[in-house]
A protein has these predicted regions:
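Short secondary-structure boundary segments
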Residues: 37, 114-116, 146
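Glycine-rich, Arg-bearing micro-motifs that act as flexible, cationic patches
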Residues: 110-135
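Small/aliphatic-rich secondary-structure junction motif
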Residues: 3-55, 82-89
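Short, hinge-like loop/turn segments at secondary-structure boundaries
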Residues: 50-54, 105-107, 129-130
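Short, conserved catalytic or interaction motifs in soluble domains
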Residues: 123, 138, 146
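Generic structural signal for helix capping and beta-alpha/helix-loop junctions
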Residues: 42-43, 96-98, 120
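A short acidic, glycine-rich active-site loop
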Residues: 54-70
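Structural beta-alpha unit
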Residues: 1, 14, 28, 74-111
Length: 147
């Protein structure tokens, strides 16, 4: 059936529901689980400005990559609670492309995504993820309907 499953997450409630469904399915069929989340790089100019204005011993603010690492760790905790081993796959760039790239590279059998993205300005961008994934996936796609 399914040997390897990819699930995309952005830390939203919808994505967390997709993670929970993917974890349950992976546990039921004994599949490997790959958790994918995308981040945007911090522009070099902004990094240089922050370095000039910050005291030398200051802690750097959490950046986009660190946010994704935390998102993936939170999703991994859900899987580990259920005894499912996971691989964390942070990727730079578009969320749908990140999911599709991992699915193709790892030759997975199933992609799991939520049907909605985050609210506000990000909703438009993230709402297109399930659509793009379902049209370009190299494998089956399970879109989790959420409220």
């Amino acid at each position: 059936m399914f040997r390897s499953i990819v699930v995309g997450t952005d830390g939203s409630d919808t994505a967390t529901q997709a993670v929970r469904q993917a974890v349950g399915l992976a546990r039921a069929v004994g599949a490997n689980l790959e958790l994918v989340s995308a981040y945007e790089p911090v522009p070099e100019q902004r990094l240089a400005e922050e370095r000039r204005s910050a005291p030398s011993d200051a802690q750097w603010a959490i950046g986009p990559r660190e946010d994704v690492d935390a998102t993936l760790e939170a999703a991994a905790a859900i899987a580990r609670e259920e005894g499912v081993e996971v691989e964390l796959c942070p990727r730079q760039g578009d969320p749908a492309d990140a999911i599709l790239d991992v699915a193709e590279e790892r030759d997975v059998d199933l992609i799991v995504v939520g049907n909605k993205g985050m609210t506000g300005a990000k909703r438009f961008l993230l709402g297109s993820v399930p659509n793009k994934v379902s049209h370009h996936a190299p494998c089956s796609v399970l879109i989790i309907r959420t409220t």
